[in-house]
Design a protein with these regions (language model features):
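Alpha-helix boundary/capping residues
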Residues: 14, 66-67, 110, 114
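A generic short-segment signal for beta-strand/edge and adjacent turn/coil regions
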Residues: 1-7, 36-41, 48-57, 102-110
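Charged, gly/pro-rich active-site loop segments
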Residues: 2, 78-149
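Generic marker of residues within folded, mature protein domains
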Residues: 10, 26, 74-76, 126-128
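Alpha-helix boundary recognition
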Residues: 11-13, 64-65, 129
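Short beta-strand segments
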Residues: 15-55, 61-63, 69-73, 81-85
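Short, basic/aromatic recognition patches
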Residues: 1-19
């Protein structure tokens, strides 16, 4: 398993903004800028890159068909990429042992791992539920290059 410590350290310097790339049906890349963070995968307990995506997002459709993603974070000229299998957990992508309450808490955990804070968690929870938001968890198979100081 690839180490995510350098990735986590690097992305914190840029508000946890990263580019996530998925693969369209025609084989071309689809990329989005998102907030992401490193946290333990709720099903495996191993470190993963997590992000939250609205239910209608193209990246979710791509990941359902081709569950692999690349995430790249940068700070100045330093950058780190993470590649790996992606798992979706959400109202349209159920997972064993993750009920509605566990999903609510997982989405919060990803948001806070990505540096987010909120003054009204009830509103946050309601908005994500209304948007049918899903957790995207990328288990690292490869990281490159090592961030340099």
């Amino acid at each position: 398993m690839a180490d995510l410590a350098g990735f986590a350290e690097l992305i914190r310097t840029e508000h946890n903004l990263v580019v996530v790339a998925t693969t369209r049906g025609n084989g071309t890349a689809q990329a989005s800028v998102v907030n992401a963070g490193v946290l333990d995968h709720p099903l495996t307990g191993r470190p993963a890159v997590g992000l939250v995506s609205g239910g209608g997002a193209r990246k979710l459709a791509n990941l359902r068909a081709r569950p692999h993603a690349t995430v790249v974070g940068r700070a100045g000229w330093r950058w780190v990429g993470v590649e790996g299998a992606a798992q979706l957990i959400g109202p349209d992508d159920p997972a064993a042992d993750i009920d509605a309450e566990a999903l609510r808490l997982l989405l919060r955990a990803i948001f806070t791992a990505a540096g987010g804070t909120h003054d009204d968690w009830d509103t946050y929870d309601r908005t994500l539920a209304d948007e049918r938001s899903a957790a995207v968890l990328i288990t690292p198979a490869r990281t490159y290059p090592k961030p340099v100081s």
